[in-house]
Amino acid sequence: MKEYNLNDTHLLQLDSQKDPIALHTEDLHVFYGDNEAIKGVDLQFEKNKITALIGPSGCGKSTYLRSLNRMNDGIANSRVTGKIMYKDVDVNTKEVDVYEMRKRIGMVFQRPNPFSKSIYENITFALKQHGEKDKKKLDEIVETSLKQAALWDQVKDNLNKSALALSGGQQQRLCIARAIAMKPDILLLDEPASALDPISTGTVEETLVNLKDDYTIIIVTHNMQQAARISDYTAFFYMGKVIEYDHTRKIFTRPKIQATEDYVSGHFG
């Protein structure tokens, strides 16, 4: 495969006065033992926008995403250095309450992972764990979350039904509803439609576009068409580094870096 100069990069710098920043990383490195999976990534994520992370398998995009709310903490021999700045706080420090932080920076995984409970209990379980006991308030949160995830009309008459009986696409939207029930500011999604059929994928994409009015969304995807359709910004990862970061339309029509152009045009990956 063609070799690229990894120092040849183009990273858009957002103007925080005009483009409010929800989250940014500074010189972020992620190690698994002696293997450096992420090599000094600086990225800014604009509030209430969708940012897509793209790149070939093994480039580090999912590792980077998981580092943003410290999901890598539970992996043996993993180590993260650098800053993950959220509301002027570096969440990559021992002083941060990780459990509370993950309420603000939620995560939806590649494969739907509903609890083996009812649809209603999937939404309310974490809320109850945090002390919410008011039945009326819980009912309101369930309805609001399911409506935002475009699932309410399909399940409103069967909230006591097992979540495992839902279709794959419905399960993934339930997982999105479960995440937003905690009222996060940021929603991280790791290839949320990769296991779904085209119709379900389209529904999830439409849901995410509608959600950005209330949430900042960062999504890993292997689907170039998906990134082009729904994201405002795109970051191209390659060999643990961000090679190019820009408005999505520029990444897909006028990339500045040869490696980016070769990847989005299908020459490798």
UniProtKB/Swiss-Prot annotation:
CDD domains: ABC_PstB_phosphate_transporter (cd03260). ATP binds at residues 55-62. It is found in: Cell membrane. It comes from the Bacteria. One of its GO terms (molecular function) is ATP binding. Residues 23-264 form the ABC transporter domain. It is an enzyme of class 7 (translocase). Its EC number is 7.3.2.1. One of its GO terms (biological process) is phosphate ion transmembrane transport. It is a peripheral membrane protein. NCBIfam families: 3a0107s01c2. This is Phosphate import ATP-binding protein PstB 2.
